[in-house]
Amino acid sequence: MKKQFAVFGLGSFGESIALELQKLGCEVVAVDKDMERVNGIADSVSYAMQADIGDPEFIRSLGTRNLDAVVIAEAESLEASIMAALECKEIGVPNVIAKAKNNRHATVLKKIGVDTIIFPEKEMGVRLAKNLMSASFTDWIALSPAYSCLLYTSPSPRDAH
């Protein structure tokens, strides 16, 4: 059975998540209040709809509790983000991931019980800085605050002489 996800907020971050999940063979419901954004992605995902993600009635009517996860990519409207996260947790969505605008927003999301809180711009900035520090590191992922997994390109034997 295909995994099913909802992505709330179709800015560049949300849109890229929705498109990649769809490309990976998942069923994706993409939601935004801006009809232009909805129209821009409608032909590329399973379902695209215009709605206010801060409206609990909408979230319940969507059947979100039956999804594998909901990604709340909307962080400009703190109220909509928080209300969507609260409703998703209250109705039993198994995995709620939310983008935080700032540390206070993240604190509220954590208190609501959001499973994963992300700061995409901050995380990408740290990742890029670490990549810039060594031409040998081609990629890395943080496993915990103390451990990382690195993809390292070793120099060719003739460069070692």
Where on the chain are the PLM-derived regions?
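Conserved acidic E/D residue at the C-terminus of a beta-strand in Rossmann-like folds
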Residues: 32
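Glycine-rich Rossmann-fold phosphate-binding loop(s) that bind the pyrophosphate
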Residues: 10
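Short beta-strand element of Class I
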Residues: 27-28
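Helix N-cap at the beta1-alpha1 junction of Rossmann-like dinucleotide-binding domains, i.e.
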Residues: 35-36, 103
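Single conserved hydrophobic/aromatic residue that forms the stacking wall/gate
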Residues: 152-161
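Phosphate-bearing ligand-interacting subdomains
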Residues: 44-134
